[in-house]
């Protein structure tokens, strides 16, 4: 299945990072926090402004980002892979 996000939404594949304790022990399962980093795999056409114009997004597919996984973030499994669908405003930074 292929999804195309609408408007100012993006689809992100979470980047898994190895979590370690202060003592260097690798944490797994519930002891490890979920990463808030990922790679954008698809973007919508843009935000619809009050005057009807569409403002293109500042991010693009392939960007590596840091995001806020909050109330408006939807998790979806597609072909066995987990993806996040969120608004561009939930993205905090782009890795350069």
Curated annotation (Swiss-Prot):
Q: Name one GO cellular component term.
A: cytoplasm
Localization recorded for this chain is: Cytoplasm
Give this protein's Gene Ontology molecular function annotations.
ATP binding; metal ion binding; protein folding chaperone; protein-folding chaperone binding; unfolded protein binding
- One matching Pfam family is Cpn10
Single GO biological process annotation from the record: chaperone cofactor-dependent protein refolding
Identify the keywords attached in UniProt to this record, alphabetized.
Chaperone, Cytoplasm
> Which superkingdom heads the taxonomic lineage of this protein's source?
Bacteria
Subunit structure, as described in the record: Heptamer of 7 subunits arranged in a ring. Interacts with the chaperonin GroEL.
The function of this protein is: Together with the chaperonin GroEL, plays an essential role in assisting protein folding. The GroEL-GroES system forms a nano-cage that allows encapsulation of the non-native substrate proteins and provides a physical environment optimized to promote and accelerate protein folding. GroES binds to the apical surface of the GroEL ring, thereby capping the opening of the GroEL channel.
Family per similarity comment: Belongs to the GroES chaperonin family.
- Please state what the protein is called: Co-chaperonin GroES
């Amino acid at each position: 299945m292929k999804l195309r996000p609408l408007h100012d939404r993006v689809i992100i594949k979470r980047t898994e990072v190895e979590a370690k304790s202060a003592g260097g022990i690798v944490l797994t399962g519930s002891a490890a926090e979920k990463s808030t980093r990922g790679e954008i795999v698809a973007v919508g056409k843009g935000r619809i402004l009050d005057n009807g114009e569409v403002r293109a997004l500042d991010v693009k597919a392939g960007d590596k980002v840091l995001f806020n996984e909050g109330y408006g973030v939807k998790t979806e499994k597609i072909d066995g892979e987990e993806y996040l669908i969120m608004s561009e405003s939930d993205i905090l930074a782009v890795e350069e």
